[in-house]
């Protein structure tokens, strides 16, 4: 679930150099990166003073950084559907995490982003979370890499319970598993291999990273880079949600998402912030 202040970040990277494109007049290779629930807590956006995102920062320096971002809907499925189909939620009718967009009548005549590239002579690839869940529209991609949930699955919970005893997806903390077993590591490695093949046909590759979506799990090494006692907490205004419409407060009251008061009263607020930053 995507919080109201979160956004789906898409970074288009032209893998071929501009000079090469200008001389040879060849179509550029395109890499699309979707990062689930990433807000402005990255170095180049300055959302949190302790955020460390050297790779995103280098990418921003090489291209154009759009810093005034808006999500089409504050939840996964409608936001991703809007981006991949080019149709806003008010036109598609997709407002929640179901149904799957390729089953929606209003989208039957829409051409998805990968199909558009395919029609222009591109070979299309994907790995990780691009659409909501692990499903994909039939025929969207020529080659499909690792899918969400196919690699490391962590069953041991670090936080025994949250609000109302609900567990859901809300858990956080460092994990001692080997870093190369984490899903995002697997997806990135697969994408790098595809890019390095350098085929004659131009490619469009969409890679979706699951973190920092809940649960906020990261390798222990990364988690410990910013000790909890040094964490700077964000400013939270009293009554900040008082002017929100009912649907927004209903989403934030879902049992899987504990209220802010739980983090404060349980003394886990700094640890949760630490975990999010580690996932970034």
For each feature predicted by the language model, list its residue ranges.
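Formylglycine-dependent sulfatase
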Residues: 22-280
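N-terminal secretory signal peptides that target proteins for export/translocation
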Residues: 1-4
